[in-house]
Amino acid sequence: MKILVIQGPNLNMLGHRDPRLYGMVTLDQIHEIMQTFVKQGNLDVELEFFQTNFEGEIIDKIQESVGSDYEGIIINPGAFSHTSIAIADAIMLAGKPVIEVHLTNIQAREEFRKNSYTGAACGGVIMGFGPLGYNMALMAMVNILAEMKAFQEAQQNNPNNPINNQK
C-alpha cells in the first residue's frame, strides 16, 4: 500500500523551531523514524513525503492523489489547520482515508489553535505525542486500509451481493 505524507508550513524548520514545544527532532529524522517503523514491522507500505510552506501546493498534492495509487494520506497541515477551509475541502474530496497529525496538543495551546478546519475533514486526528504521533497515524492507517480491503473482498465474495449476481 502506498501512503502520502504531507507536511505543511514551518515543519521544515523542526529541530530549530521552538525546541521547548517541538523538540530537537528534524523533519528528515521524523521521516527516517517512519521508514524504520515500516521496515521493523515488515509492513507492506511505501511512503512518499512532501513538504511545502504554500497552501496551494498542499491542495494540489491532495488533488493529485485522487485517482492515483495512494491509498491514504497522513497530513500535518501546520498552522493551515486553523485557517484553511480550502485544504479541508480538498481533504473531503480526496476519496480516501486521511489522518491529521500534530506534534503538540493543539487543544492545550493558544485559543486560536484549538480549532482545526482540516482535522474536522479528516477521519481522525492524533496530537500531542511528538514524533511518535506519525507512527501512531501510520499504524492506524495500515489498520484502516486493511479493514477496507477485507470488507471489499468480503463483498466481492458474497453470493448474496446483488452486484455479484448480475449477468
UniProtKB/Swiss-Prot annotation:
Coiled coil: none annotated. Substrate binds at N76, H82, D89, L103, T104, R113. Its EC number is 4.2.1.10. Keywords: Amino-acid biosynthesis, Aromatic amino acid biosynthesis, Lyase. Pathway: Metabolic intermediate biosynthesis; chorismate biosynthesis; chorismate from D-erythrose 4-phosphate and phosphoenolpyruvate: step 3/7. Pfam families: DHquinase_II (PF01220). PROSITE patterns: DEHYDROQUINASE_II. GO terms for biological process: amino acid biosynthetic process; aromatic amino acid family biosynthetic process; chorismate biosynthetic process; quinate catabolic process. The record marks R17 as: Transition state stabilizer. It catalyses: 3-dehydroquinate = 3-dehydroshikimate + H2O. The active site is at Y22, H102. GO terms for molecular function: 3-dehydroquinate dehydratase activity. Belongs to the type-II 3-dehydroquinase family. Catalyzes a trans-dehydration via an enolate intermediate. Homododecamer. PANTHER family: CATABOLIC 3-DEHYDROQUINASE. This is 3-dehydroquinate dehydratase. It comes from Helicobacter pylori (strain Shi470).
